Amino acid sequence: MFIGEYNHGVDSKNRIIIPSKFREELGESFILTKGLDNCLYIYPMEEWRILEEKLKKLPLTNKDARAFVRFFFSGANEISIDKQGRALIPQNLMKYANINKDIVSIGVATRIEIWSREKWEEYNDANIDYEQIAEKMSELGI
């Protein structure tokens, strides 16, 4: 399970450090793709296969389903971690997530989210009513 928040930079070759606690669970390679809220999602291969199967079952006749599947698969890249614990972020994903210099990696149970530091701070500064969200989650059995 991925938990925690880590701050680090991006080098001149668009490489980021994958925190050691995350590397242990990711293995040698993983899938990096566009995420919601203009962040990037990292999935271990096993979790990606589970998501992939669910996405492939969505009806091709549904316009929203097609758009959602395109969104995830068009941005997906298989990424390897080098010996220094770094991973290369493709330029199109850097642009999508507005990543320039500093990033925040957060563990979100089965995936990792990569945020530009600015976007993460904006997200955290937004007036999110977590009590209201908690009520909605309780309706879903959480």
From Swiss-Prot:
One of its GO terms (cellular component) is nucleoid. Gene3D superfamilies: Transcriptional regulator MraZ domain. The keyword DNA-binding applies. It is found in: Cytoplasm, Nucleoid. One of its GO terms (biological process) is negative regulation of DNA-templated transcription initiation. SUPFAM superfamilies: AbrB/MazE/MraZ-like. InterPro entries: MraZ, MraZ_C, MraZ_dom, MraZ_N, MraZ_sf, SpoVT-AbrB_dom, SpoVT-AbrB_sf. One of its GO terms (molecular function) is DNA-binding transcription factor activity. CDD domains: MraZ_C, MraZ_N. Keywords: Cytoplasm, DNA-binding, Repeat, Transcription, Transcription regulation. Residues 5-47, 76-119 form the SpoVT-AbrB domain. Forms oligomers. Belongs to the MraZ family. This is Transcriptional regulator MraZ. It comes from Clostridium tetani (strain Massachusetts / E88). The lineage of its organism: Bacteria, Bacillati, Bacillota, Clostridia, Eubacteriales.
